[in-house]
Regions:
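Short glycine-enriched, charge-decorated loop/helix-capping segments at active-site entrances
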Residues: 73-80, 147-153
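Canonical radical SAM enzyme core domain
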Residues: 14-56, 63-69, 82, 107-119
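Single conserved hydrophobic/aromatic residue that forms the stacking wall/gate
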Residues: 1-10
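Glycine-enriched alpha-helix->loop->beta-strand junction motifs that scaffold or abut catalytic
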Residues: 53-59, 127-131
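Auxiliary Fe-S-binding modules of radical SAM enzymes
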Residues: 95-96, 112-219
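Surface-exposed amphipathic alpha-helices with a cationic face
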Residues: 24-32, 91-96, 163, 167
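Glycine-rich S-adenosyl-L-methionine
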Residues: 76-96
Length: 219
């Protein structure tokens, strides 16, 4: 029942989504069910983005490094020696894509959010010309715990300081922020997301058994 009411599909986990060969078809299918789509990519496959027949409702590009040196240190590309160069291509491609664009900066204290990095991020953001810039704090979970520590998590005040310094360099302003999530939104204005018109519908009976919260203990 909850799945039939789904209105937003986030395409981001289980690896880089632009490696999926039927991505455009999947996005189109989501839109046909009246869902918005949010595609999160590391930007290292610009040709895939350029050739998508159907673009997502909103495209998030991870801009986690201000330059190649920091990129190689933090993102640590293993299979693509030219990852930074491909990412750089994506930055210049973004203004030509007819969809909502967000540049997301995941900020790691002591690594990629030093004062000298801010103008470099601004230069990338100005080239990409996104609708919004999202500045969010790194969270010490998952595999990142092998390389980083809890001390690398910035406070919300750090995120706000970074965002307020970045905003005027991109001719934007701080629009909103969330202290619990340690995230700030930089842009010119907040515009409601367009909802695709549904042309396909899920059947009333999906053939899925009702969930069981408590099972009897078998002695």
């Amino acid at each position: 029942k909850e799945y039939r009411r789904q209105r937003q599909m986030c395409i981001r986990d289980s690896g880089e989504p632009t490696l999926y060969t039927r991505l455009s078809e999947y996005i189109e299918l989501c839109h046909s069910h009246g869902m918005t789509t949010m595609l999160v990519t590391n930007g290292t496959l610009p040709k895939v983005l350029e050739k998508l027949d159907t673009l997502p409702t909103q495209l998030y590009v991870s801009v986690d490094a201000p330059n190649k040196e920091v990129f190689d240190e933090i993102c640590r590309p293993k299979w693509n020696a030219a990852a930074w160069e491909k990412f750089d291509e994506t930055i210049d491609l973004l203004p030509s894509l007819d969809t909502r664009i967000v540049c997301r900066h995941t900020l790691i204290k002591g690594r990629n959010m030093k004062p000298e990095h801010i103008p470099q991020y601004a230069a990338l953001d100005n080239r990409a010309d996104p609708d919004w810039i999202e500045c969010k704090g790194y969270v010490h979970v998952g595999n990142s715990r092998e390389n980083l520590t809890a001390e690398n998590m910035p406070f919300h005040e750090d995120i706000l300081d970074f965002s307020n310094a970045l905003a005027p360099l991109t001719d934007r302003k701080l629009l909103d922020d969330s202290p619990p999530s340690r995230v700030a939104l930089v842009g010119r204005e907040i515009v409601p997301i367009p909802i695709p018109e549904a042309t396909m519908y899920f059947p009333e009976d999906l053939g899925i058994a009702e969930s069981v919260k408590h099972l009897k203990i078998i002695q």
